[in-house]
Amino acid sequence: MDPLTKGSCGSQLAQTLLWKAKSSLSFGIQPLQTWPTKDPELESQVNLSVSEDLGCRRGDFSRKHYGSVELLISSDADGAIQRAGRFRVENGSTDESAAALPGTWRRTDVHLENPEYHTRWYFKYFLGQVHQNYIGNDAEKSPFFLSVTLSDQNNQRVPQYRAILWRKTGTQKICLPYSPTKTLSVKSILSAMNLDKFEKGPREIFHPEIQKDLLVLEEQEGSVNFKFGVLFAKDGQLTDDEMFSNEIGSEAFQKFLNLLGDTITLKGWTGYRGGLDTKNNTTGINSVYTVYQGHEVMFHVSTMLPYSKENRQQVERKRHIGNDIVTIVFQEGEESSPAFKPSMIRSHFTHIFALVRYDQQNDNYRLKIFSEESVPLFGPPLPSPPVFTDHQEFRDFLLVKLINGEKATLETPTFAQKRRRTLDMLIRSLYQDLMPDLHKNMLNRRSFSDVLPESPKSARKKEEARQAEFVRIGQALKLKSIVRGDAPSSLAASGMCKKEPWEPQCFCCNFPHEAVCADPWGQALLVSTDAGVLLVDDDLPSVPVFDRTLPVKQIHVLETLDLLVLRADKGKDARLFVFRLSAVQKGLDGRQTGRSRSDCRENKLEKTKGCHLYAINTHHSRELRIVVAIRNKLLLITRKPHNKPSGVPGVSLLSPLSESPVEEFQYIREICLCDSPAVMALVDGPTEESDNLICVAYRHQFDVVNESTGEAFRLHHVEANKVNFVAAIDVYEDGEAGLLLCYNYSCIYKKVCPFNGGSFLLQPSASDFQFCWNQAPYAIVCAFPYLLAFTTDSMEIRLVVNGNLVHTAVVPQLQLVASRSDIYFTAATTVHEGSSGGSSKGASAHTSPQTPPARDTPLFPSSLGEGEIQSKNLYKIPLRNLVGRSIERPLKSPLVSKVITPPTSIGLGVAAIPVTHSLSLSRMEIKEIASRTRRELLGLSDDGGTKTEGAPRAKSKTRKRLEESQGGPKPETVRSASSDRIPSGILESPASEANPEGHNHWASSEQDAGVDKEGSPGSGSSPFQLMASSEEDIIDLK
C-alpha cells in the first residue's frame, strides 16, 4: 500500500492532496495539461490550459464544421449553363495552417443520430407487453391516442412510466418516475405533455388489434432499412447521361463496392430488396447489400442495373437511383480534374450526394458531401482533412453519414408535410373505426383519474384472460416484424467494440456522503457534502476543508484568480463567502478539522445576506463578474482593478496580501426584477465595450437584462400550466452569443442579437431550434458537440447543433455534482457483501445490462438481493474526451470493452467476441429466431419427448452448412466489411462454451483498469455500461 494512504487523515495526507491541488496555486499560475497526439509533427505534446478547456466546454462552436451553403452551377462541354441549385457543401476544414494547432477539428465521433433502438418505443417497450391505450379529442377537435406502460428501465431496477402521445403533428414520448405511494392518472400524464384541454375525456381501448394500428403509426417515422444509389462517373464526365451510360466500372470502383457490402443474387433473395425485382431479374442479376448496426442497406449500383444501348438516357437506371434520397457518386480521376456537382443530376428527389474519390497511389479515400439547402444539419462532420487511410473506418463513417442524412431529409418541409398528412389520415380513420364500439361498450370505460397500473377489481379472471390475449397478439405482431426485417433492433448487431467519449472513469469508490455540489481544484475535487466541504482525490481519505456548520450550496474554484467563491445557505443568514485559495491551502497544512462558520466571519460579502442564487461569467479573460440574486433583487459585484506583475495573472501588488479578499470586491449596482429568479446565466457581450447580459427565468418566462441599464427584455414565454425551470446555458456560435433555454421536457436555442444603439433586438433566427427530452432533466451540461441531460436515473445525450439523440444511459440514483470543466457525478452501484476489491467488477456483473436477469426475477424488486449492498461511487467524465480536441483520447477508461449481446429471448452470458460479417448467416439468424419463437407461441417448446431430439440435429446441420459455406470449420471468427451480424452458431453457444479469447479479453481489460488504481476496490466498475443493454439487444418474444 502507498505509505501516503496509511494512518489517519493527518498532515501527511493533507499535503499529498494539496500537492495535487496547489499545482496551480503559485499565486494563480495555471499549470499546463499535456495531451499526446499521434501526429509526428505534433509529437512534442500539445499544451492546453484549463481556461481554454472551459471555453471549449461552454459552447464555443461553429456550424461551419457542417459545411456552408453555396450556389452550384453545372455546364455542358461547351460551357453553356444547364442547371443550378443551392447546396450545403461539406469538405472538411480548408485552413491549411490549422493542422498544427491544438484546437483544430481533427477527428469526430461517429454516431447514428436518433437511433431506432432509442426512438421506436412502441415496438421496444409496448408491443407484446401489458399496456393501456386511450383515445380522445383535443380542444381543436383533433383526435389523439395515448399509450402508457410501466416498465423496468433496461433491467436496472428502475421502474418508470413510458407514455407515447400520437397526434397528427407527430409523436411525443416522455418518461415519468414511478412512485409506489403516489398514484398517476391519465390526466396528469397528458398534462406533462402540455395537453390540458379536451373536447372529451380520453377513453381506454380494449381491442388487442389496436396494437397493429399503433405499430403502423410508429412506422411513419421512417423505415429502419435504407436504399442508397451508387453512381459510377469516369474522369471528365459532366452530365448524368454520360454517368448513367457507363456499362461497367473500374477496378477501383469494384474495390469500393466490395468495401460497401456483399454482392448478392437478386433472384430468390428473401431479405430487404429496396424496390428491386427478386423474381424475374428485370432490375439486374446482382446487387450490393449489407447490414450495419441492425439496418439492412441495399445499394442501387448503376453498373449492375439494366443497361440499354438504344436508350441514351438509361431510364431504367435513373428510375431507381433518381428516386433515392441519398446517392454516392464514385468519381475517377485526379483531384485537379473537373469535379462533380449535384446540379449535373436531374432529380427532384435526391437531396444528398456523397462524392467519393480513391487515391490509388496513397490507397486512401476522400469524401465530400453535398446536401440540399433545406436539409437540416446532420453529423458526423467530416474530419480535417476529409481523407481516410483506414478503409474500415471510412466505411463506418460513410454509412453513418448516409443513414443520418436520409433521416435528416425526412425533416425537410416537403417530406414533413407528407408525413403529417399521412398521420392525420391514419389517426382520423382509426378514430372513426373505434368510436362506435367505444360508445356501445360504456361498461368498460374507466375513470379519467384511475390509477394506471391497476386492473379492475371486478371480473378479475376476465381481465386476466383479456390481457393474455392482448399480449399474445402483440408478440405475434412483433414476430412478424422481425421476420419481415422491419424490427428496429439496431444494437442487436453492433459492430466492433467502440469506446464512447462519454464513458466515465471511477474517481472515488464507496463515497459515503451525500454530495451537494463540487468544483475541481487541480487534480482533486472540492465537494460540499452533508458532512461539510471535503477535498477528495481518487480513493485517498478525504481532507475536511469546512465543517458542517457551513452548508455550502454553490461553489466555484477560480484557480487562475487564486479565489474560492461559495454560497452558504442557512435560511435568512445565507451569504456569499470569498477566500484566497492560497490561504485555504495554508490553513489546511497540519489541520485535522475543517474551518467552522465562525472561522469564516472575515470572508463574508455582507451585502449578499439572504441570497438564494448566484452566477459568474465563465470566461475569465475579462474581469470577474458575479451576479447575486437576493429574492427579486440582482446585485452585480466585480473585483476592483489592480496592477499585476507581468506573466502572473490574478496577483495583486498590494503588500502584504490580506488573508481575506473581501476588500477587493466592489458592488456596482442593484437591479430589481418582478419576481425571484429560479435560473440565472451571464452572457458576454461581443466586445469589451459592449454591454453584458443577464438571463433570468421566473414565472412563465425567460428574460434578458442589460447589466448597465437594468432594462429587461422578454426572450421566451413558456406556454404551460406548470413550469420547472432547469437551466439557461450561454453558448457562442462563431463569437455570437446564444442561449439554450431548458424547462420541463423542452430545450430551445435562441440567438441573442447584439445591442444596437442602446436597444436590444429580439427577432427570430433561422438557426433557432427546439427539441424535447425523453425524461425531465434537473441539470444540463453543454460540451460541444454534445448536450448531456441528467435525470434521477438516466443520462440523455444529444447533439448541440440539431438536438438529435445519440445515446441514453441508465444510471440509477444519478446526481450531478460538478460540470464547469470535467463532469463529476455520483451513482449507485450494487456489489456482493464480502467481495474483495479485485473482484468487485465481476461480483456486480449480474446487474449489468449485458446480462439479462433470470425469468423468475421480480420486475421491480422492492429491496436489494440477498448478499447485496448498495454504495455510491463518484465518477468523472473527462471534458477533453467529449470535446474531441485530440486525435487519440489521452485518458484510459476503466470500463470493460463493449460486449455484443445476442438478439434472442434467451439471455446468454456471451463474452467479448469478434463479430463476423456473413450475409448468409445474418439471414439464417433471423430465420432461427423466427422458428424458435414460433414454436414458443404455438406451445411447441422443446420440453422432452421427441421434440428435444430435433433441435440438436437441426443445430448440427446448421453448423455443418455454415462450415461448408465458409470452406470448412474455422477456429476463429473473422470480421469482414459487409455486415455487422453475429453468427447464429455463436448465439446458441452457452456461456461456458464462449470463445476463450473473448474471456481473455475481459481479463486483460480488468488488468489494464487495475493499473491506474491499484488496490482500489471496484475502481473499474461503472454506473452504466455504455453498450447495448439487454432490453435494447434482446427482442423479448416470450
From Swiss-Prot:
GO biological process: regulation of small GTPase mediated signal transduction
UniProtKB keywords: GTPase activation, Phosphoprotein
Positions of post-translational Phosphothreonine modification: 851
Keyword Phosphoprotein found: yes
Entry annotated with the keyword Phosphoprotein: yes
Compositionally biased region (Polar residues): 1019-1028
Residues found modified as Phosphoserine: 68, 449, 455
Highest taxon of the lineage: Eukaryota
InterPro entries referenced in this protein's UniProt entry, alphabetically: CNH_dom, Rap/Ran-GAP_sf, Rap/Ran_GAP_dom, Rap1_Ran_GAP
Family per similarity comment: Belongs to the GARNL3 family.
Protein name as catalogued: GTPase-activating Rap/Ran-GAP domain-like protein 3
Organism of this sequence: Mus musculus (Mouse)
The gene coding this protein: Garnl3
